[in-house]
Amino acid sequence: MTFRFDNSYARDLEGFYVDWPAAPVPAPRLLRLNRPLAEELGLDPDLLEREGAEIFSGRRLPEGAHPLAQAYAGHQFGGFSPQLGDGRALLIGEITDRAGRRRDLQLKGSGRTPFSRGADGKAALGPVLREYLVGEAMHGLGIPTTRALAAVATGEPLLRQEGERPGAILTRVAASHIRVGTFQFFAARSDIDRVRRLADYAIARHYPELASAPEPYLAFYEAVAEAQAQLVARWMLVGFIHGVMNTDNMTISGETIDYGPCAFMEGYDPGTVFSSIDLQGRYAYGNQPYILAWNLARLGEALLPLLDGDPVRAADKATSVLETVGARYQGHWLAGMRAKLGLAGAEEGDARLAEDLLEAMRSQRADWTLTFRRLAEAVTDEGALRPLFRDPAALAGWLPRWRARLAPDAAERMRATNPIYIARNHRVEEALAAAHAGDLAPFDRLLEALADPFTERADRELFALPAPEGFDDSYRTFCGT
């Protein structure tokens, strides 16, 4: 099968990676192929159904593939690790999709690499299918994200903390896999030439309009800050908690990447944490905008020598960008919140209106997704929100203020903005448990709902319901891919 690879990272950035083959697997089996994505990439899904097990397991890569493990560093929970890199993943190449966009193809769970740091480099079935589900859920919500092209069972059992688990490999598609940590890897070694080469490559690939800017590296820094501020605002608007916002998990492209311990919040609480390794709550839901700024500061540090030859002026320029991050984020968040609330135009008191609703939701632990979805019904039915709030009077003072700001077509706009289906934790776990037992039908049904999250259907009612009371209080997520 022809993939039409054009591997610019391997060609232009020698020394930024290690050539490495995928580990052999005993009995690969294609579990799921993302046919719409395959077509978007200009690939033949029918051929991939037949040949995908061999290709996406790494056992028989297509002509032109160039498997490599990328080098990067990163701050993990605030502590700097000068060498991380692809410890269980291989970039196999780049292709141009039907829209003319360059896309990376990466195998996750393909075995040890020189960056594995003692791990086996493999991925278990559950985490692979989880990333597939959540990535497609984010895509359905219109949030920039890496996506899953395929999931392959390897036929190899893996020993994990919870016992023996079947092995699997995810084929991930991304605008690129360049991270804040990629810049940090070379900056930590004072290799300014490679920092510059990486910046030039990233500009050419993601922000080509900046190449002719008076200060292209400063403009690049601003562009990444803008892309990430918009991304994190969109996470917050749907109640998404990434769970591991390390600098090696922040892309230059502005896509969501690495879904290991992520989850969607149900009852609204800014302190919500699901990740089993986030013991201090560093990456809690409400902290994500602050970590956004912290991570961008680390990118600024890596770029300092490119911003100006004078260290003081370079620091001033980086600071001038960082000082805009809060306003950038707030602007995107407020614009999104106005849409979620169905407001007409923009008025000065809109932020307070939104914050007052959130405070009422917090005090009642109201379900994030259903509250905003049922607001569309509350345009004409005051009782629509009562089942979601323990205190029926919680919104008594807020509702008249909100109604006074509504656009004429508010209900219709709100239903197109506020999803009815998200990847609720208990439904994801049910789908994964069934998959472990050999039944992928629940996975398929959930995936179908998540691909169309704004269209409410009677036969999907179960996917809209919150978890049983107490489920999320003890629910924990893990870094599995």
Curated annotation (Swiss-Prot):
Domain of life: Bacteria
Catalytic activity: L-seryl-[protein] + ATP = 3-O-(5'-adenylyl)-L-seryl-[protein] + diphosphate; L-threonyl-[protein] + ATP = 3-O-(5'-adenylyl)-L-threonyl-[protein] + diphosphate; L-tyrosyl-[protein] + ATP = O-(5'-adenylyl)-L-tyrosyl-[protein] + diphosphate; L-histidyl-[protein] + UTP = N(tele)-(5'-uridylyl)-L-histidyl-[protein] + diphosphate
Cofactors (names): Mg(2+); Mn(2+)
Organism of derivation: Cereibacter sphaeroides (strain ATCC 17023 / DSM 158 / JCM 6121 / CCUG 31486 / LMG 2827 / NBRC 12203 / NCIMB 8253 / ATH 2.4.1.)
Binding of ATP, residues: 85, 87-88, 108, 120-121, 172, 179, 258
Signal peptide feature range: none
Full protein name: Protein nucleotidyltransferase YdiU
Molecular function terms, GO-annotated: AMPylase activity; ATP binding; magnesium ion binding
Sequence similarity: Belongs to the SELO family.
Keyword terms of this UniProt record: ATP-binding, Magnesium, Manganese, Metal-binding, Nucleotide-binding, Nucleotidyltransferase, Transferase
Enzyme Commission identifier(s): 2.7.7.-, 2.7.7.108
Binding site for Mg(2+): 249, 258
Ranges annotated as spanning the membrane: none
Residues at the active site: 248
Function: Nucleotidyltransferase involved in the post-translational modification of proteins. It can catalyze the addition of adenosine monophosphate (AMP) or uridine monophosphate (UMP) to a protein, resulting in modifications known as AMPylation and UMPylation.
